[in-house]
């Protein structure tokens, strides 16, 4: 197999520095009332990798990615997290980077597991799910989405 060796300057397009990632909440400012937005999603999300061939719900990623794939870091204050929702065709994988989270699933969120730093859970398509920061500090959750990026449905 033939390989390539990018220059350090060329590799910079594949580096995402957390402090430089824009908060996606700014993308919906003025379009969705802040109170409603915070019920639907994490306090802020920062897109790391996203497809370059279409606009994603989180905006373009700093690092270009393949179709139907995104990496987002969700920032949640204690008690914060999105509402119960499902993705018909998308697998969502959560890894706790900071604080502690509860991941709930089921049509009413009747099942749950708590995860701590570096613990990971992958939720398959078609399962109602939500997450919330149950720690005392700001939480960071690494979220990998694999599948159609606009197939979300919120619980009634």
Can you annotate each of these PLM segments?
Residues 64-68, 88, 136:
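A generic fold-level signal
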Residues 71-75, 93, 112, 120-122, ...:
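Conserved hydrophobic/aromatic beta-strand scaffold that supports enzyme active sites
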Residues 1-16, 128-156:
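Double-stranded beta-helix
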Residues 52-59, 70-88:
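Conserved short histidine dyad/triad with adjacent acidic residue
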Residues 80, 103-105, 110, 138-139, ...:
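Ligand-binding pocket scaffold of soluble enzyme catalytic domains
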Residues 1-68:
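A short, N-terminal "cap"/entry segment at the start of jelly-roll beta-barrel domains
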